[in-house]
Each structure stands twice: as structure tokens, then as C-alpha cells.
Amino acid sequence: MMKKIIIINLISLFFLNFANANDPKSVGKFKNWETFTYDDGKGKICFAQTIPIERSPNNFVRKPSRLFVTFRKSEKIRDEVSVTSGHEYKSSSVTATSGKNEFSMFSQGNFAWLIDREEEASLIKTMKKA
């Protein structure tokens, strides 16, 4: 009987590990950023994410906002900037602001992406300066 229980537990552990094989895996943290890798079946995806340090007003109730910078080597995508604000966007166009710089984004559901690759490069440059 004990042997049967051990075998069932080992099989369960195998399937649990297999089911979680494609979950994003944290690679490390640097200041307010955390980096992850993930395999979507087409290839490895690497991304960094950060969450706001401060939220206003204090009683703000919604899922946390996140800013992502993603690399998809198999699709030749690098420095793809996206954001989720924890809610569905009401409009299809979104504006991200950093200092005096404004960046146009398009949204789908609760995510938004920069429209223009040149703006992505400019936003990455702005973020590196900050």
C-alpha cells in the first residue's frame, strides 16, 4: 500500500512540474525591475517588468499596473514596450507621459503598446536616463 502511495505521489509531482514548465521564470531583480524568461512554443521570450512605486489615491482599488519591455528573438522583436493598468481601457488610444515626453499607444483589453518603433526607441532611451 505504501509503495502505491509513493508511486502516485511521484507521478503527481511529475505532472505538476510538466504543467508549470511554461510558466515565466524569474531570472533576477535589479532595483525596481524583475526579469523573466518564458517559452511560448515558438521560442524563448525574455521580458522585464516593473510596478509603480507609488499609487494615488491611496485607496485606489484595482489590479497593479505593470510596465513591460519584451524581447522575442524568434520574431525579431526587441525593446517592445507595453503596459497594463489593471483595468480595461475605455479608449483604443492611450498616451504615456514621461516628463515632457508623450508617447502614443494603442490598446486592446487591459494592455497598451507603443504604435511607432521610433517612439519605442525614444521611450527606452528616456527610461534609461531616469
Describe the predicted segments one by one.
Residues 5-17:
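Sec-dependent N-terminal signal peptides
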Residues 1-2:
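N-terminal secretory signal peptides that target proteins for export/translocation
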Residues 21-130:
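A generic "folded-domain core" signal
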